[in-house]
């Protein structure tokens, strides 16, 4: 409280250490919390993530909030097309400035980045309702895979993701897909509703 922060720093804190307060600040930077949630849900509709209703900006449990592994894959695919997102998500460590004289260290909780060749990024999470969750992306030999996990036993999600990615790369071109991810709708949400990375917010 009483400090201002760069939007880019808030995104980095959100994606590296799951800073729930950063998610709240980013949502409110759209004008209000309700406006921020409207932007999030509009983006979900644009991506045809129809299993998703966001109630909290940080994903903490709330009545009527829900998503699916399928929708998380849609979000990850979209993130892979956004250089700014990848920059924040692939940050392994850094400093988060608080005021003019103080800073705290950031270390990316996604250990896949440092331990899996070809890892592109991802996000680890946990809530009481969802259990341990994980979204991970990796690329090898020109082939990109996304893996999504929900309700994992604690501390097993990274190893489970590695096993799924290993299998996916091993069978590339040898198996038939059971389906395809829906593409985004043609109309896009207004980017003016989103805070610019260079902006400072209180």
Question: What is each residue range found by the language model?
Answer:
Residues 1-70, 74:
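Active-site-adjacent loops and short helices of periplasmic peptidoglycan-processing enzymes
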Residues 49-53, 57, 61-202:
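Domain-terminus/edge residues, biased toward the C-terminal soluble/receptor-binding domains
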């Amino acid at each position: 409280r009483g400090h201002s922060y760069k939007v880019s720093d808030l995104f980095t804190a959100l994606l590296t250490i799951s800073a729930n307060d950063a998610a709240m600040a980013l949502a409110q930077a759209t004008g209000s919390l309700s406006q921020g949630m409207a932007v999030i849900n509009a983006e979900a509709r644009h991506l045809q993530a129809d299993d998703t209703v966001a109630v909290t900006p940080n994903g903490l449990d709330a009545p009527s909030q829900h998503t699916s592994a399928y929708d998380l894959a849609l979000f990850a695919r979209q993130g892979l097309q956004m250089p700014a997102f990848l920059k924040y998500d692939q940050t392994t460590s850094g400093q988060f400035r608080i005021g003019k004289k103080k800073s705290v260290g950031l270390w990316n909780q996604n250990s896949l980045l440092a331990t899996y060749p070809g890892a592109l990024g991802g996000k680890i999470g946990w809530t009481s309702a969802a259990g341990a969750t994980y979204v991970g992306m990796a690329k090898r030999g020109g082939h990109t895979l996304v893996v999504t996990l929900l309700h994992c036993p604690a501390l097993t999600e990274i190893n489970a993701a590695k096993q799924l990615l290993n299998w996916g790369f091993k069978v590339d071109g040898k198996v038939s897909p059971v389906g395809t991810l829906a593409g985004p709708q043609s109309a896009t949400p207004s980017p003016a509703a989103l805070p610019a990375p260079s902006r400072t917010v209180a």
